[in-house]
A protein has these predicted regions:
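Conserved donor NDP-sugar-binding/catalytic core segment of glycosyltransferases
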Residues: 96-127
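N-proximal low-complexity "stem/linker" segments adjacent to membrane-targeting elements
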Residues: 1-25
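Acidic helix N-cap motif at the loop->helix transition within catalytic regions
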Residues: 15-18, 43-51, 92, 96
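A conserved acidic beta->alpha catalytic loop
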Residues: 23, 30, 38-47, 64, ...
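The conserved acidic donor/metal-binding loop of glycosyltransferases
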Residues: 88-92, 116
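Glycine-rich, basic loop-to-helix element that forms the pyrophosphate-binding segment
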Residues: 62-79, 100
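Conserved nucleotide-sugar donor-binding catalytic segment
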Residues: 77, 130-211, 215-216
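Short aromatic/hydrophobic "clamp" motif used to bind/position activated sugar donors
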Residues: 84
Length: 253
């Protein structure tokens, strides 16, 4: 049974992190390590995490606040698992998430995968929305739009290797996918295996279109080191594909 390293950066998520950790502890697949990297929270995050005595849970705190991108990088450097999975400190997994996704990748020889997820509000109440996506995302497809939800992604670190991203303020999960998609296509496991907490502070997807354009443009310029014209092109494609996703893949139950 291969080890799965779960990457959980956190900052002032004391209200939600216990529920997120409990969703990891409830997994039917038990060979995992949970790497919680705290970016200098000022709430009770540390006390909550240290209340867990499970040796698979590892808590680290940055010496100073360095932002989500570098915090995620630190967790990735510490990871020992063959597979890398991601769970933000306010999101949740369903119990069979790891078991089903590891099996899916192993059976088909996939190196990079994602799943459907449902949405809940800030109080954990189901909104009736399910987010799906295309079965296969190529490099071109990933550059066109960030199809996977971060909480659903898993990749084979044995094949992909260590991934580190630039110090960007937003879209750092998307920056990771753009690195990985150069080495492997991303495949969909078509089942809801995670719950995303909608309405979180700072989420790019919850901001107005002008703000989304700004952060996507900076992603291509700063993280991918693209020239102006290609950056503008991919930013435009992101806006178009975002509208398409809402029509094609965001389902109201």
């Amino acid at each position: 049974m291969n080890l799965v390293s779960i990457i959980m950066p956190t900052y002032n998520c004391g209200r939600f992190i216990k529920e997120s950790i409990d969703s990891v502890l409830a997994q039917t697949y038990d060979n995992w390590e949970l790497l919680i990297v705290d970016d200098c929270s000022t709430d009770d995050t540390e006390a909550i995490v240290r209340g867990y005595k499970d040796k698979r849970i590892h808590y680290m705190c940055n010496e100073q606040n360095i932002g989500a991108a570098l915090t995620r990088n630190r967790a990735l450097r510490e990871a020992k698992g063959r597979y890398i999975a991601f769970l933000d400190a306010d999101d949740l997994w369903l119990p069979e998430k790891l078991e089903k996704q590891v099996a899916f990748m192993g059976q088909h020889g996939y190196q990079f995968s994602y799943t459907y997820y449902s949405e809940m509000d800030s109080d954990g109440i189901d909104t009736g929305i399910t987010v799906k996506g295309p079965f296969k995302i190529t490099k071109a497809g990933m550059y066109a739009f960030c199809w996977p939800g971060c909480l659903t992604v898993m990749y084979d670190a044995q094949s992909i290797g260590l991934i580190q991203i630039e110090d960007i303020q937003k879209n750092n999960d998307y920056a990771l996918w753009l690195k990985i998609c150069k080495k492997a296509d991303c495949y969909l496991l078509p089942e809801v295996l995670a719950r995303y907490r909608r309405g979180r502070s700072g989420s790019v997807s919850s901001q107005r279109i002008s703000t989304m354009i700004k952060w996507h443009y900076k992603l291509y310029r700063d993280a991918e080191m693209m020239q102006v014209i290609p950056s503008l092109w991919h930013t435009t494609m992101n806006i178009i594909c975002g509208a398409y996703k809402k029509i094609k893949y965001v389902k109201h139950n």
